[in-house]
Amino acid sequence: MAETRSSPEERRPGGILRAAAVSRQFEGVRALERVTLELHRHEVVGLIGPNGAGKTTLVNLITGFDFPSSGTVELEEIDITAWPPHRRSRAGLARTFQQGHVFRGLTVRENVEVSALGVGARPTEARRRSEGLLGMLGLAQRAEQQAAVLPHGEERLLGVARALASEPRFLLMDEPAAGLHEAEVAEFAEVVRRVRDEHETGVLLIDHNIGLIMGVCDRIHVLDQGKTLAEGTPADVRRNVDVAAAYLGRRNGEGAE
């Protein structure tokens, strides 16, 4: 298979992933209103908010599965607003999905290799990435098993391995802890830290598990009714009265647990 490389412009090192004043309107309903979010490499940013706050809409705009009504999406100072998902992937932007997004008819190893091949890696390089990622995520013993037989928690990890196989500089994780039990959530938190620290990847983590968000994120961005409600460190967000009222179920200035 011939190796396909993205252009130097699309692989500029370093930088920031930025959604700048993005809005999205559906048939007269404004799902997002002038939201700005920045993600740097080597950090984890949490994105939280009530159901319907606009979290998945924002992720779709950033990853190219939808396009903003106004505003821009920028990857390392390049305007990628009109780029399709595959071009963003080759430029260093990856995403995991709520349902895992794995090929159930392939082996665990093949799932990861296909992702690497999809961004232009040669077969030998795809195998190297697969072996390294499966080892890091504790899936090496599952390498030759069909993805269809994986339990839920391991299927989520395979989704992460597939995303990392493209060697992204920025990774968006959509509800990765959904359906995981407490011990699996703790293990997953360590995976997120390793992705940030060992791969020097910026991670945008979208999840309803507040314990995970507070425990692993460097910064948190809160959406409510399509608008930015608050942003800051976990401690800042925990103390924010508006967040407590809108999302964490607290009133009258009490801090969230």
Model-identified regions with their sequence ranges:
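Glycine-rich phosphate-binding loops of nucleotide-dependent enzymes
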Residues: A2-E257
